Amino acid sequence: MIANYHTHTTRCNHAVGLEREYVENALTMGLKILGFSDHTPYIFPGDYYSHFRMKLDQLGDYVESVLSLRKEYAGRIEIPLGLELEFYPKLLPQLLPILRDLPIDYLIMGQPFIGNEIDEPYSGWPTEDNRILERYVDQTIEGMYSGLFTYFAHPDLIHFLGDDKVYRQQMRRLCQAAKNCNMPLEVNLLGMMEGRIYPNRLFWELAAEEGCSVVLGRDAHAPKHILDIKTETRCLELVRNFDLNLLETVPLKSI
């Protein structure tokens, strides 16, 4: 890997380490690009609190921290400023003007919840419900076609235990949409490292059949994740086994 665009900070409440430690480890690994893409704040109705993302009043500090590191390490490594954003169509109109007033270089789409998160199950929970899978695919396709995102992180996160034929049908639809709108799909190193449901081999078989482009994403929640050569090797083996079109870098899409 020469680039990683999927890096978190402690502001999301489930990552550790200083941003500087991630950058130093990236230099150790010979990376040319280390993009930070922590979980974006969202403006939810009522008193709902989303525990796995930064608060809105932390966004300015996040931006300042990344831009400061970019200036300090200029000439040694590129440090683009990004966010990982869930595609919640009903909530985006309030959030997007805020993000567009900031020097955000890119967004990556992650979809751990369908709907608007508040009253929906986590997409990674096991389900045999065909409708949940269909809704996940519908919402992520809408997100890909929105033009907001540079790539789709862990698209195979959904944990569907129903009929393989249904999974193939729906996820092929997702992959076809990704191909049609030139949306790279992320092979997620954190999922591989922790033995999660993703990377899902059946999904990547479909992605290969549809000719999708892919990118490796460390999804780093600790500085040591940047140094994890073993997991990188395993993900590269998956890419080679399915003859996937691996992108070393991706063009960033501004919002």
Residue spans of the language-model regions?
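Hydrophobic alpha-helical segments and helix pairs
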Residues: I77-Y122
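Mid-to-C-terminal alpha-helical segments outside catalytic/metal-binding sites
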Residues: I229-I255
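An N-terminally biased module of ancient metal coordination in phosphate/nucleic-acid-related enzymes
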Residues: M1-L85, P89, L99, L161-C175, ...
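Short, hinge-like loop/turn segments at secondary-structure boundaries
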Residues: F52-M54, W125-P126, F203-E205, E232-C235
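Short amphipathic alpha-helices and their capping/turn segments at secondary-structure boundaries
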Residues: E19-K32, K90-I104, Y136-S146, R172-Q176, ...
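Domain-core and long-helix interface of multi-subunit machines
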Residues: N13, M109-E210
